[in-house]
Swiss-Prot record:
Enzyme active site: 88 (proton acceptor)
The protein's name in its UniProt record: NAD kinase
HAMAP family: NAD_kinase
GO cellular component labels: cytoplasm
Location(s) in or outside the cell: Cytoplasm
Family: Belongs to the NAD kinase family.
GO biological process, one term: NAD metabolic process
Binding positions for NAD(+) per the UniProt entry: 88-89, 93, 162-163, 173, 192, 203-208, 262
Keywords: ATP-binding, Cytoplasm, Kinase, NAD, NADP, Nucleotide-binding, Transferase
Function: Involved in the regulation of the intracellular balance of NAD and NADP, and is a key enzyme in the biosynthesis of NADP. Catalyzes specifically the phosphorylation on 2'-hydroxyl of the adenosine moiety of NAD to yield NADP.
Catalytic activity: NAD(+) + ATP = ADP + NADP(+) + H(+)
Gene Ontology MF: a single term: metal ion binding
Length: 305
């Protein structure tokens, strides 16, 4: 059995990382870590046989696909669990590494809010026991995918848990975008960007840009303009079986494609981005009981009294 561990690289997370590696190794499971954790002294001192992705041989574990200027990767061997130590960014990086594998993902919260990660550092012993015994529930969340066409040829595929966005590359510039739903042009906008978000991503960038909060089990896709110049350019909620096409009409090419907050590709005028819901779900492992409403109240510190 293999456990994949993602680490945010911060000193504060090292003791937690080392402890988890030791707990996992004590239960006769092998540990593969992401490159951020490969120089971690806490793990090396556990004598637990912890192996980084690079040490294990990247070609053995990784499917590499390089499209200038971004490089995407995914791991092509099975893991019984993935554990991230950090905030939402670390969790999202782990989800990307393990995409399309069906691996249950768990997050230990070392960040400020950590909306996607719900395990506190003091609960890591119980977490490992729950994983070993299979005592956890699974929430299946559908990702969002995008395919970029340039001059009639596909040049890039993208994947995200929360959102795929088209954004301006330079401050002070706007992005001109045509939005099509099922082949019908529904919006021509000048804006700072546009967000195509999943239900899971409704509490992330979409929320901060005026999009609605959507319960994660809802099968919908959100289209949310960022600071649009048009008066009636409002967020749209679509069933997840609708096709969404974005066409870049900006003339200066100062536009980028991002997934889960990371720049993946520089776009050009005329590029077309087709967005669809992914077919293979992301599996969130849960060891705590609780409803989404309670999670909202806690994470956003809502005043309910």
């Amino acid at each position: 059995m293999r456990v994949y561990i993602a680490h945010n690289g911060c000193l504060e997370a090292e003791p937690i990382y080392g402890t988890i590696c030791e707990l996992v190794a004590q239960r006769k499971m092998s540990v593969i870590t992401d490159p951020h954790a490969r120089n971690n002294e806490s793990a090396r001192n556990t004598d637990s046989g912890v192996v980084s992705l690079n040490q294990a041989g990247r070609n053995k574990y990784l499917d590499q696909e390089t499209t200038s200027p971004a490089t995407s990767r995914s791991i092509n061997v099975p893991f019984c669990a993935g554990i991230s130590i950090g905030g939402d960014g670390t969790f999202l990086r782990m989800a990307r590494d393990l995409k399309n594998t069906g691996t249950p993902l768990f997050g230990v919260n070392m960040g400020r809010m950590g909306f996607l990660v719900d395990i506190e550092p003091e609960d890591i012993v119980n977490l490992v026991e729950n994983i070993v015994k299979g005592e956890y529930t699974e929430e299946k969340r559908l990702p969002i995918t995008a395919s970029v066409q340039r001059g009639g040829k596909k040049i890039h595929d993208e994947w995200a848990v929360n959102e795929i966005t088209i954004e301006r590359k330079v401050e002070g510039k706007v992005v001109d975008i045509e939005v099509f739903v099922d082949g019908c042009r529904v919006m021509d906008i000048s804006c700072n960007g546009i967000i195509i978000a999943t239900a899971t991503g409704s509490t992330a960038y979409s929320f901060s840009s005026g999009g609605p909060i959507v319960w994660p089990e809802m099968k919908v896709t959100l289209v949310v303009p960022v600071s649009p110049h048009e008066l009636f350019a409002k967020p749209i909620v679509l069933p997840d079986n609708r096709s969404i096409l974005l066409k870049v009409t900006s003339r200066d090419n100062k536009v980028v494609l991002c997934s889960d907050g990371q720049v993946r590709l520089c776009l050009q005028s005329g590029d077309e981005i087709a967005c669809h819901v992914g077919k293979v779900p992301v599996v969130f492992g849960r060891v705590k009981k609780g409803c989404f409403a309670e999670h909202l109240v806690k994470k956003f510190n809502l005043q309910t009294a």
